[in-house]
Design a protein with these regions (language model features):
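Active-site lining segments of carbohydrate-active enzymes
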Residues: 156-286, 297, 392-406
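Long, well-ordered core segments of solenoidal/helical folds
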Residues: 72-84, 130-148, 197-223, 259-279, ...
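Low-complexity, Ser/Thr/Pro/Gly-enriched N-terminal "stalk/linker" regions
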Residues: 20-92
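Carbohydrate-binding/catalytic loop surfaces
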Residues: 88-99, 149-168, 220-234, 242, ...
Length: 432
């Protein structure tokens, strides 16, 4: 194991201040009127097989098919866990958020597993239990985590039924249930049309209407309360990507869809204006999948819904955002950590490969292959978009030669830190 010296020295750098820069990269691509003509309606942009296309799913899933079925089988007899009022109140009373998040998260994991299992098998074996999960979620007063419910107007911990909170959790559930509606509406209607009718209603109220009409959420970076240059983090691309996929899967009125898409562009532009042009992730390497990674998800979806006409992957800033994760890796499972990021990691191999493909980075593709040694079936929990997107490139990733060339010097002048290394890093395997 060779010695590596990695220096992160924000405090030793010249004290140059790099402020908010109004780049507005996305809005420079198009205006609202031109955007309307670009949009692909009626889910014609979806390239995945319909649920009933069994040969299509067998081909798409390949050797991963059985893994999804086995995961779903674990939940065939799952007992859905009630999240009690006192579980929400615990956050206000004692600061305990896990008492609410643990059962809530397990329920959400069950829905995701059942959804993917039924897509994989296609025999209806998982549908009833999937319906149970869908209806269970529809009956909840809120899809937000207890720690975030306080964003509602009352600022209290118990959810208000008429004031939906759009946080990371609500957006993630919106993503998952929008795909559920898209793939299984016809199957649900054969059981009882009320299932899909109720699901569509809850998605409209909690996700679509809330995004369009409530600008009170800080991550949106809009409204009279927002001041340009105020701190924005991974919540912005993460929540906006979830909002965008919901609109893409559910909204087919051209004017409404254009309004929503353009609102996401304005919001994500504020994030891209806030972060530094050098591409470093200020939140640390373990947040890369949530900040640059969710920016990738968002930009891919935006390109898809506009038929490739709104595409900023050629921007050097975007490529630098992607390559930050490979530059942070020093070998043997270690990364250069700071803030509250972990020192162990390297990232989601499929996400890294997708980023490399989008920005044409052989560095990222080779690094993704290095991170993909286990070669397990792609799984991103209730982030169905990311699981499906990972499956699309799974074979390409498996055929890519692993490689991580340790860069001797990477300087991030605006974020003000630098990576310096000697020789080959901690693990010789990382340089192959």
């Amino acid at each position: 194991m060779k010695k590596i010296i990695v220096l992160t020295f924000a405090l030793l750098c010249a004290a140059t201040t790099f402020a908010y820069t109004e780049r507005n990269i996305l809005q420079k691509q198009t205006d609202m009127e031109r955007l309307k003509d670009m949009l692909i309606l009626n889910q014609e942009w979806v390239t995945y097989p319909d649920y009933v296309n069994r040969k299509g799913w067998d081909t798409f899933l390949g050797t991963s098919k059985e893994a999804y079925i086995r995961r779903g089988e674990k939940y065939l007899d799952y007992q859905w866990q009630v999240v009690k009022a006192t579980d929400y109140l615990a956050y206000e009373r004692t600061g305990d958020r896990k008492i609410m998040e643990n059962p809530f998260g397990t329920n959400n994991s069950a829905v995701a597993a059942l959804l993917m299992a039924e897509l994989a098998e296609g025999k209806g074996r998982f549908v009833d239990q999937l319906v149970n999960g869908v209806f269970f979620l529809c009956e909840m007063s809120s899809w937000a985590n207890s720690a975030h419910v306080v964003l509602q107007r009352s600022n209290r911990a118990l959810p208000s039924y008429d004031n939906p909170v759009f946080d990371l959790s609500a957006g993630g559930i919106g993503n998952m249930l929008s795909w559920t509606y898209y793939f299984f509406k016809d199957s649900f209607d054969k059981i009882d049309p009320e299932i899909s009718r109720r699901l569509r209603h809850e998605l409209q109220v909690r996700i679509l209407d809330t995004y369009l009409n409530d600008d009170s959420f800080w991550w949106m970076a809009r409204g009279s309360h927002y001041k340009k240059g105020r701190l924005l983090n991974n919540w912005n691309p993460w929540c906006n990507s979830n909002a965008l996929i919901a609109f893409m899967l559910l909204e087919n009125n051209r004017d409404t869809l254009a309004k929503a898409v353009y609102m996401t562009m304005e919001s994500v532009d504020e994030f891209l204006n806030y972060i530094k042009a050098d591409g470093a992730c200020e939140e640390g390497p373990s947040y890369w999948g949530h900040a640059p990674g969710k920016t990738l998800d968002y930009l891919e979806m935006l390109s898809v819904i506009t038929g490739g006409k709104v595409n900023i992957f050629a921007e050097p800033m975007i490529k630098s955002m992607g390559e930050y994760i490979s530059r942070s890796y020093v070998g043997d499972g270690w990364v250069v950590n700071f803030a509250d990021a972990s020192a162990k990691g390297g990232g989601d191999s499929h996400l890294i490969y997708r980023f490399g493909k989008a920005v044409d980075s052989d560095e990222l593709k080779g690094f993704a292959a290095l991170m993909n040694q286990k070669r397990s079936a792609p799984w991103s929990g209730m982030d169905i978009f990311r699981t499906l997107a990972s499956l699309e490139i799974d074979n390409e990733l498996k055929q890519t030669a692993p490689q991580h060339i340790n860069q001797p010097f990477t300087w991030y002048p605006e974020t003000e830190f630098c990576y310096l290394s000697t020789k080959d890093g901690l693990d010789r395997k990382s340089t192959r």
